[in-house]
């Protein structure tokens, strides 16, 4: 219920401009809990080989990963691997903040060229890293960097000859990991997250050893990735990598075509200029002298409402009016709630930019379909009986029967007695 990234007044990371796509069915394509047996996050990364039809030893220069999240130790081992045929290089994903859009554009072009040259030199593990940021050099969005390199190497026919590993402080949430993998990353290293976990353990804010806390974080990300993959019926991470099963909201067609391998832009939006400006703003804030050592980061109210934080559609005023309206059956309070929802002070959703265009001359009511007939076209959303609970299921059935329309919920499980039960003459079945 927070503003879309493209209309937010605050600087946004690039991850926030994407939404997951999913199979729109009443039952999950795969149940990631009960059907976990058919799912796998095991990945083999490295050089596939130049000719898969004539296999040779070059096809075997790969590393098996049980999951795509690498710890700092695992990444260090990969960086210093000394076996014949295993070569690693680290490419910085930074741009000069003084140059703005041109600096970001040239940095991306140079990054792609460096990646191609590395492949030509026999490097089969390319690590894209933003560890070296400073007050003059901001991080290129990790998603933009990996997608740009991924699609560039595809265009020159060299993508399968190397693995792309992202070492970034941006990665925190499961969605971030899913996006990076979905746009071509072979593995990821969220070093900043591990640093935060280490700090929490050192300050005894987490009552467990660092190794256990680190393992728990990786386990949480793994379960989250399986849940995201299951929404599209994908059972292995190897099928998910590079699949780009996301929708961008607020990015321009030019940006998507050049760096993300698609021209589909629902509403258009920002390009490199705005991305450079937002990441420059975030970088300057990070290196601002106004911050003292040990100062807590501000809570901007992303996940829960805060007075001076990010705007929320479901703010305390809206929730209070809705609760009062339902508890008291007050139509006045309902109208107040509807006013808050329909006429926000600042836009949050795309629909907030739209309004009804009133006709110059009202159409007589006797020339249009009556209200009683219109409501019969409505149906409820499809949810299972178990997900709704008996109380909600009966309330929906009663309401739909009163209106003369249809309830699309149930999926079995109703008590047979309901077929013979009614409330005020209205059936509960």
What do the PLM-derived regions correspond to, one by one?
Residues 131-133, 169, 185, 192-197, ...:
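Short, ordered loop/turn segments at secondary-structure junctions
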């Amino acid at each position: 219920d927070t503003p879309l990234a493209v209309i937010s007044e605050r600087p946004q990371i690039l991850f926030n401009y994407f939404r997951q796509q999913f199979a729109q069915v009443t039952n999950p394509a795969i149940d990631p809990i009960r059907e976990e047996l058919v799912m796998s996050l095991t990945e083999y990364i490295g050089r596939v080989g130049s000719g898969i039809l004539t296999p040779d030893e070059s096809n075997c220069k790969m590393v098996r990963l049980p999951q795509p999240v690498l710890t700092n130790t695992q990444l260090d081992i990969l960086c210093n691997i000394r076996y014949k045929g295993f070569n690693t290089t680290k490419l910085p994903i930074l741009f000069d903040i003084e140059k703005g859009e041109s600096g970001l554009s040239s940095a991306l072009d140079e990054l792609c060229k460096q990646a191609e040259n590395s492949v030509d030199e026999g490097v089969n593990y390319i690590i894209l890293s933003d560890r070296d940021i400073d007050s003059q050099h901001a991080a290129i969005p990790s998603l933009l960097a990996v997608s740009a390199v991924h699609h560039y190497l595809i265009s020159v026919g060299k993508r399968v000859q190397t693995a792309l590993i992202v070492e970034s402080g941006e990665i925190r949430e499961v969605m971030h990991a899913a996006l990076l993998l979905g746009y071509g990353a072979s593995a990821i290293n969220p070093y900043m997250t591990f640093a935060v976990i280490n700090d929490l353990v050192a300050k005894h804010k987490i009552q467990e050893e660092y190794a256990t806390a680190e393992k728990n974080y990786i386990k949480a990300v793994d379960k989250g990735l399986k849940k995201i993959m299951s929404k599209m019926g994908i059972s292995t991470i190897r099928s998910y990598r590079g699949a780009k099963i996301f929708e961008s909201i607020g990015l321009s067609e030019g940006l998507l075509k050049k760096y993300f391998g698609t021209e589909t832009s629902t509403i258009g939006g920002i390009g490199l200029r705005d991305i450079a400006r937002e990441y420059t703003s975030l970088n300057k804030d990070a290196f601002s002298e106004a911050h003292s050592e040990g100062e807590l980061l501000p809570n901007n109210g992303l996940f829960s409402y805060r007075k001076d934080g990010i705007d929320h559609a479901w703010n305390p005023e809206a929730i209070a009016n809705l609760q009062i309206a339902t508890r008291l059956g007050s139509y006045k309070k309902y109208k107040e709630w509807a006013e808050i929802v329909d006429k926000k002070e600042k836009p949050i959703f795309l629909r907030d930019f739209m309004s009804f265009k009133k006709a110059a001359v009202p159409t007589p009511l006797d020339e249009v379909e009556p209200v009683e007939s219109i409501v019969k076209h409505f149906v409820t959303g499809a949810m299972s009986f178990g997900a709704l609970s008996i109380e909600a299921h009966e309330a929906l059935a009663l309401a739909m029967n009163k209106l003369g329309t249809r309830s699309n919920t149930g999926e079995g499980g109703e008590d047979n007695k309901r077929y013979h039960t009614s409330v005020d003459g209205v059936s509960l079945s």
